[in-house]
Each structure stands twice: as structure tokens, then as C-alpha cells.
Amino acid sequence: MTIIVTGGAGFIGSNFIFHMLDKYPAYRIVCLDKLTYAGNLSTLKPVMDNPNFRFVKADICDREAVFQLFEEEHPDIVVNFAAESHVDRSIEDPGVFLQTNIMGTATLMDACRKYGITRYHQVSTDEVYGDLPLDRPDLFFTEETPIHTSSPYSSSKAGADLLVLAYHRTFQLPVTISRCSNNYGPYHFPEKLIPLMIANCLNDKPLPVYGEGLNVRDWLYVEDHCKAIDLIIHKGRVGEVYNIGGHNEMRNIDIVKLICKELGKPESLITYVTDRKGHDMRYAIDPTKIHSELGWLPETKFADGIKKTIQWYLDNREWWETIISGEYQHYYEKMYGNR
């Protein structure tokens, strides 16, 4: 079994590679990654010497490079994690998101059509559904919820999802799609809420919180997400969408305060900044379908997952301190310096 994992040097992709090589030692895993700002080759250091692992630096939009890789490897399965994923960056430069998230997906599916695969899996997001009102805690996103995007990022992911389903209907490509809630855990790039707050706390820097911090997110530990995708690519029904939720809804401000408490830092570090444009209020996923069909449920409670995550950042300062130097500092000042 050969699996191409695109975006495998990023947060979720790298965790998925670790999971698959550990669980299926006979599988061959090929990572294709462009190594943008969010891709870090050092993340893959634990598997670089594994004889069943190969890393290829390439852009999923590079048709020649993608087709060459398929010619060499003849993969059985393709799992596409490769994406521009940060909402704030999509507001600053939407074009990059459209190119990578939609056109890159099209390139991968064209390669799958030419070389033949048993499964193409698209890793997507609950953000394609838009948001839910704070005063309706009884409402959840299901796979039947209409697409109603709020940002250039979510629009690009929705466009890719629709393209994947169209390739299934038009060309009978064997596809599946998963839409997950917010992930957290090891190797998370420190522009996202949880790793940003941990890093800033450890450096006694201000903790920028959008608006009043009342936005609610459903949090999914990355290892649980990887196990769900593992199930889908092996047992999921072709042509189907599966929602993957963590059953861990929390307000942003409560998460930030919890991180302060765990690290023994004062809440006075919290700084409220101008809210994000079009900021979604609440995400909440109903994972009934994946539970009933594939037997998956999240295993990690948020209280346990956040402790493990914080400890990982304490134990791996060199990894994230290297990341937040250079270009990231320029981006950070641009996003939060004058808000």
C-alpha cells in the first residue's frame, strides 16, 4: 500500500504521517509538500530515516511535478492536507488561497484520474458551513447543512469540496471528504489561537484576543482527527462527506484564560483587539454519521488534550521559537501591532 500525503510537513499532515507509519509499518508513505511558511521539514525528522517514508518538495499546483511523482510511485491512496488555511491571511491575500486550495486540488484529481487510485481523500473544514448563532446551542452542523461560507479561506475550501464531488460524479473518481472542527495538538503553527497563546504566554507577551473573545469553537485533538481519517480512507463510503467533531465547545476567551492558568501567567496579559472581518460566531459539528457508520468517537477530552499540548510546547521550545523568528514576526506585527 502506497499513500501520497500532500501537505505532510504541516500540522495535521505530519501528525497523520506519524500515525500511519506507526500503525501500518508495511505501508509506504510519500509526503509531497511545498514547504511554505507553515510547512517545516524539521517536523518530519522522526520519520526521515524510515525506509518506508519519502519526502518530495513540490507544489500541488505544479502539474509536471505532481504527475511525475504519480508516475514514480503509483499510489493506492491520496490524502490531501495541502492548503492555505489561515483565515486572516486569506483576507489579506485571497488569490493565494484560490490557487492552492482549488487549482491544486484539481491537479491532484487529474493525476488520480490518469494513474488510477483506490481512494482520493479531501481534508476539509467545518468553516464551509458558515457559523451558528450563540443563542442556539441546540444547533449543529451536519453533512446536510448547506454550504454558506464567510471568508475567502472557507470559500476556497468549499470550492475544492464541490470540485471533488464533481469529479466523483463525472469521472467516477473514488473520493471521500472530511470536514473537521478546530484542531489542536503538537506541531501546530503558532499563528493559530492555542499555539499562539501558549507561545506568547511563555514569552510574557500580550495575548491578542479578537473582539470580546466570545466566539465559540469545537476543539478536536489532532490525534483523534488522524484516527478518523484513517477509518474513512479504509472503510468510508465512496462519494460521501464525513463530519469530524470533538464534542469540546469553548469560548475563545475561556481557552486563553485556561492557558494562562495552566502556565501560571496573569490574565492581565490578555489584550482585546479589533475583531476579525466577518468573524464567525460559533462552530459546532454533529459527528453522528462517522460514529454510526465507522464507529469513530473523539477519545481526548479538552482538559486532557490542552495539558498534553502545553507540555509539548514546553518540551519543544526550539521547534516553535525558530518558527516565530524572521518572516513570522513581520506578519505578527502586521496583524496585531495596530489593533
Placement of each model-derived feature along the sequence:
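Residues that form or flank phosphate/diphosphate-binding pockets in enzymes
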Residues: 12, 38-39, 64, 188, ...
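A glycine/serine/threonine-rich, flexible loop-to-helix segment
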Residues: 47, 135-136, 190-198, 274
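C-terminal substrate-binding subdomain of Rossmann-fold SDR/epimerase-dehydratase oxidoreductases
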Residues: 3, 29, 58, 195, ...
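N-terminal Rossmann-like NAD(P)+-binding domain of SDR-like oxidoreductases, especially those catalyzing
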Residues: 1-183, 308, 313-316, 322-339
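The catalytic Tyr-centered alpha-helix of NAD(P)H-dependent dehydrogenases
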Residues: 137, 149-156, 186, 190, ...
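Residue-level recognition of oxygen-bearing side chains
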Residues: 65, 96, 103, 146, ...
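Hydrophobic alpha-helix immediately C-terminal to the catalytic Tyr-X-X-X-Lys motif of short-chain
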Residues: 159, 163, 167, 197, ...
